[in-house]
Design a protein with these regions (language model features):
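N-terminal, positively charged/glycine-rich alpha-helical extensions of SAM-dependent methyltransferases
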Residues: 1-25, 173, 184
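C-terminal alpha-helical "lid/dimerization" subdomain adjacent to the S-adenosyl-L-methionine
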Residues: 13, 158-210, 220
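Conserved alpha-helix/loop element of class I SAM-dependent methyltransferases that forms part
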Residues: 25, 35-55
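Class I SAM-dependent methyltransferase SAM/SAH-binding core
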Residues: 56-112
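A short acidic, Gly/Pro-enriched loop at the edge of an enzyme's catalytic core
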Residues: 111-122
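A short SAM/SAH-binding and catalytic strip from SAM-dependent methyltransferases
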Residues: 121-135, 158
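A short glycine-rich, Lys/Arg-flanked "PGG" loop and its adjoining helix->strand segment in the class I
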Residues: 136-151
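Core SAM-dependent methyltransferase catalytic element
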Residues: 208, 214-238
């Protein structure tokens, strides 16, 4: 994978502090920097799941709860986990505005989920796996809590494969996005970190191979919006 110049710091304390600092402006920046496409991508992830067994569904790295809300439109039993308490507070405010049953949010590190093995029907993560300190450990933990034949849907930023899109995308990612983030966020460094973390993240075939290595089957990837985002899906073995 084409990387940034230096490995990004993904220690739990660094990531937690960064996202807690940007929490008040996080939704505004998501809408602005994605041209409001982030909500559409989250719906795509929710719609990629069959949710056939009626078991609870968990969104990890849940942030301010938008993916959990997209899931709630598909199924009543939704959980949302994130280790940033300021992010979760915003998520809880959103959950309080919808009819019961509401998503249940709780503080947790994706690497150590406080859930029994084989307890979930599905698990999702949107734009969060590139922030974990140990990607393979996170995938193993996601696999652990899924029931047999349970599903996963993972959204992550990607580099467009087309040169026509890649060059303007990289210019925006490296030059414009960090400036906008710096103007609007008290922690502008989060938006310098973003392009570096994307460029160092395994993509497409490499990522689905990592999914298969921890036990997922039927691992597939699907480009969204010209390949700037990738949707990955898979299942736990029966």
């Amino acid at each position: 994978m084409q990387g940034g110049n230096q490995p990004v710091d993904k220690s739990g304390q660094t990531i937690e502090r960064m996202f807690s600092a940007v929490a008040p402006r996080y939704d505004l920046l998501n809408r602005l920097l994605s041209a409001n496409l982030d909500q559409r991508w989250r719906r795509k992830a929710a719609d990629a799941l069959t949710l056939a067994n009626g078991a609870p569904v968990l969104d990890v790295c849940a942030g301010t709860g938008d993916q959990a809300l997209a899931l709630r439109k598909r199924t009543p039993r939704v959980l949302a986990a994130d280790f940033s308490v300021p992010m979760l507070r915003i998520a809880h405010r959103k959950f309080s505005r919808i009819l019961a049953p509401k998503p249940a949010g709780f503080a947790s590190d994706t690497l150590q989920l406080p859930l029994p093995s084989k307890s979930l029907g599905a698990i999702t993560v949107s734009f969060g796996l590139r922030n974990v300190a140990d990607l393979d450990a996170a995938l193993r933990e996601m696999h652990r809590v899924l029931k047999s034949d349970g599903e996963t849907a993972i959204l992550e930023f990607a580099l467009p494969r087309s040169d026509l899109l890649r060059k303007p995308y990289l210019f925006y990612f490296r030059n414009i996005l960090p400036r906008i983030g710096g103007w609007l966020s008290p922690r502008g460094s989060a938006y310098t970190y973003l392009p570096d973390s994307v460029m160092q993240f395994p993509q497409r075939e490499e990522f689905t191979r990592r999914m298969e290595d921890v036990g997922f089957r039927d691992a597939h990837w699907h480009d969204l919006t010209g390949g700037i985002v990738c949707l990955y899906t898979g299942r736990r073995d029966s």
